[in-house]
């Protein structure tokens, strides 16, 4: 936490990493769903779903999805089935957690159950590793993160599985979609 706090207070570093590399956008529309979206068919939830469906359906070249758990509804699978039949067929690229990187094994199991179906829909699926080979290039002092940690809850509950790699286990939690490099949907980047 101390190392991260020092980086967060380093204004030149923040500017170099985030401000200098920022892209200009021409238009931003904000839409959200209700917290209890699964319990409601409210107008705002239906409108949000329709907007997302229309954006994805408009894809001409690529749909790039980033999600920690690749679990699609029946309607979403139908949409991607229609895209597969389209000429030219847009490339569907998915970045998601691997089993080793996920924090929700049961959701990964559900995703794995449907993986063949997603591949038949033409998805190119890339799974995030918990210890990426280039983590030290992406995160300053990566090997020092987690040093001296005393969190052994997992050991107590599941038994020991000693790590042979320095650094902390990484996992993806961001949810986003980029369509044709032009439209971006950002879910919860937390």
At which residue positions do the language-model features occur?
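Charged, low-complexity intrinsically disordered terminal segments
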Residues: 1-190
